[in-house]
Design a protein with these regions (language model features):
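Aromatic pocket-lining residues of Rossmann-like dinucleotide-binding sites
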Residues: 6-10
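Rossmann-like adenosine-cofactor binding region
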Residues: 30-107
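Hydrophobic/small residue at the entry helix of a nucleotide-binding pocket
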Residues: 1-3
Length: 129
């Protein structure tokens, strides 16, 4: 739920948004709303396009951004993980490689999904400005 709200808010800020979904029907729905979509696992996509991402948001509470995925993204990327604990990002790898990664684990559970997206937008706007 939070991922959908977040994707919508990012698109309203004129961002190009790519949504990763396991189910083909969910990817089709994302594309119907104007988002790009990719299937899990992410590695094949990131090997080809990973350096193009400025921001990566994770809402999956299991490791989907492991060292294998992260070595294929730009060192300039900002990763924001809002999944429930334990999160889905290898933060040890991020620290060791001086990647900008924010742990906001469980944020949607602490606030409503809409409010969480608004909070994240403020963080992004501060980072951009």
């Amino acid at each position: 739920r939070c991922g959908k709200v977040l994707a919508d808010r990012l698109m309203r800020m004129y961002s190009r948004v790519t949504v990763a979904e396991r189910k083909e029907s969910a990817r089709a729905q994302a594309e119907a709303f104007g988002f790009d979509s990719v299937p899990f696992p992410l590695l094949p996509h990131l090997q080809k396009y990973g350096k193009e991402y400025a921001y990566i948001f994770n809402t999956v509470p299991k490791k989907v951004l492991t060292s294998k995925e992260l070595e294929n993204v730009s060192g300039e990327v900002t990763i924001i993980d809002i999944a429930s604990r334990p999160g889905g990002t290898d933060f040890e790898y991020c620290r060791a490689n001086k990647m900008n990664a924010v742990q906001a684990l469980g944020l949607p559970g602490k606030y409503a999904p809409k409010r969480s997206a608004e909070v994240l937008m403020k963080v992004i706007e501060q980072h951009i400005n």
